[in-house]
Amino acid sequence: MEETTESIRLYGVLVPGIARPRAGGGYELIAGHRRKHGSERAGKTEMPIIVRNYSDDEATIIMVDSNIQREDILPSEKAKAYKMKYEAMKHQGKKSGKNTLDEVGEAARENAKKVQRYIWLSRLSDELLEMVDTKKLGFSQGVDISFLSEEAQQWVEVIIEEQGCNVSTVQSGKLKEYGKSGELTLAMVRLILTEEKSKERKVTLKADKISKYFSDSYSNEEIENIIISLLDKWREEGAV
């Protein structure tokens, strides 16, 4: 905000804001809120504005597009913005023949899948969204938890605060799975979030030890698939 304020103090507002007339008189600012705030801080009493008669849906889309590219935008802000724009575009009806998620993503240079995940994230409670903003809860974990009921989300928030635990993707995946089946209880949430995370075991196979089993015609992917296939067969035979 300091950079914006200083720029306005030196050069003024270079890009006009966008507003629309209010039914009861006056104007509603649609885009340019940061420029307005920067102007006030810089001691300016006026800023350039373009006035258009936009519908509610058009105003929502313009507002989202003007804010979504901010470098400092929080995950919660982006989630709510994408949801607002998606709903506004759906309300308008399809005009281009494209998927609405694709259209939302194109304007923000993100793919439809990422946009969908942000929209799911918007279903989190305000408390959990704040945890995502402050990186106390990961984005992917937040998306998983967004599938839970409001009550179950409250359980998750309380236990995270109580235990100070970091939720892994494995744990959030379990919460989502049990939540979908309707089997999730407070006790189960507590058990899942407080269970000791198993240490990931890494095994490295040296090339000189396995090269004698494969000719040069095999690619690395083919070798990996064969090894996995043999291990699956070994497990099925009761070796593990």
Segments and roles (model prediction):
Residues 9, 13, 90, 120-123, ...:
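Signal for well-folded cores of large energy- and translation-related assemblies
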Residues 123-126, 136-195:
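EF-Ts-like protein-protein interaction surfaces
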Residues 174-230:
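Charged/polar low-complexity intrinsically disordered segments, enriched in acidic residues
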